[in-house]
From Swiss-Prot:
Keyword Transmembrane among record annotations: yes
Active site per database record: E145
Transmembrane portions of the chain: 4-24, 39-59, 159-179, 199-219
HAMAP family in the record: Pept_M48_protease_HtpX
Cofactors required: Zn(2+)
InterPro entries linked to this entry: HtpX_protease, Pept_M48_protease_HtpX, Peptidase_M48
Organism the protein comes from: Verminephrobacter eiseniae (strain EF01-2)
UniProt name for this protein: Protease HtpX homolog
Compartment(s) of residence: Cell inner membrane
EC numbers for this chain: 3.4.24.-
Gene name as annotated: htpX
Class of the enzyme per the UniProt entry, highest EC level: hydrolase
Length: 292
């Protein structure tokens, strides 16, 4: 729940900041000055919605490094670090993507992949994961993250978030205009948006943002099943990924920052807002999958 909340709040912050800038530039007055211009509003919503989502994507890797305290490694350190880098290199080559940056961060068992582009992503694992799993299980977890990159999940989730943002921005302003018109129906002398418009759009931007987060979380859960299957393919068998998930079931997962939401290995909390399916469901999906 904390991870998806951070995701929602950060995304909303970007969209709201863009909204404030647009208001200062007089965009709202242009949209509503002579009646609601739906065509212009749709264009504005698309720019706002996808702009906010892609800004979040572009800053995801540096934000992830900062928020999780990731230490980037190149394989020149300890034997364990060399093994991690070589494992990422091998799996990335098998998946047909460029070599990601590799990092380690302190904390409870977890891992994540992030970044705007397939060939310049970041894969990071926690010290708790390295200490609590066998190498085969860690390799399966890394395979899961590499599969996220190969599947284009960062861009896919950004596009979905962009669509949801567009819906939020468009609908909140349509309702805001209707509320504002109803409140000042006897005051035809006023032009441009009034207080009712601004208050309504701000409240609905936040409220509808949480509704959109439920939809985004559902899509994220489907991507997790695909990444699990991708890890099994990269490993050549399902058992290492099943074993890693089973072991995670007995561990206390770390909380990932927003920039890794929907991409970490640990399970989420909450039926609607969870970005990850229950570990039991993921294990069952792997066990029931047909292997070539």
């Amino acid at each position: 729940m904390k991870r998806i909340l951070l995701f929602v709040l950060t995304n909303l912050a970007v969209v709201l900041v863009l909204g404030v800038v647009a208001s200062l530039l007089g965009v709202n007055h242009y949209l509503t000055g002579n009646g609601l211009n739906l065509g212009a509003l749709l264009g504005f919503a698309l720019v706002m919605g996808f702009g906010g989502a892609f800004i979040s994507l572009l800053i995801s890797k540096p934000m992830a490094k900062w928020s999780a305290g990731v230490r980037v490694i190149d394989g020149s350190g300890s034997p364990d670090e060399r093994w991690i880098v070589e494992t990422v290199r091998k799996l990335a080559s098998q998946a047909g993507i460029g070599m990601p940056e590799v990092g380690i961060f302190d904390g409870a068992p977890n891992a994540f992949a992030t970044g705007a582009f397939k060939n310049s992503a970041l894969v990071a694992v926690s010290t708790g994961l390295l200490q609590g799993m066998t190498r085969e299980e860690v390799e399966a977890v890394i395979g899961h993250e590499v599969a996220h990159i190969a599947n284009g999940d960062m861009v896919t989730m950004t596009l979905i978030q962009g669509v949801m943002n567009t819906f939020v921005v468009f609908l909140s302003r349509v309702i805001g205009y209707a509320v504002d018109s109803a409140l000042r129906k006897n005051n035809d002398s006023q032009t441009g948006p009034g207080m009712g418009y601004y208050v309504t759009t701000i409240v609905l931007d936040i409220a509808l943002g949480f509704v959109a987060a439920i939809i985004v979380a559902w899509f994220s859960r489907q991507r997790e099943f695909r990444a699990d299957a991708g890890a099994a393919r990269l490993m050549g068998r399902r058992q290492p990924m099943i074993a890693a998930l089973a072991r995670l079931g007995g561990m206390q997962p770390a909380q990932l920052p927003k920039s890794m939401a929907a991409l970490g290995i640990a399970g989420g909390i909450g039926q609607w807002f969870s970005t990850h399916p229950p570990l039991e469901a993921r294990i069952a999906a792997l066990q029931n999958a047909h292997q070539d």
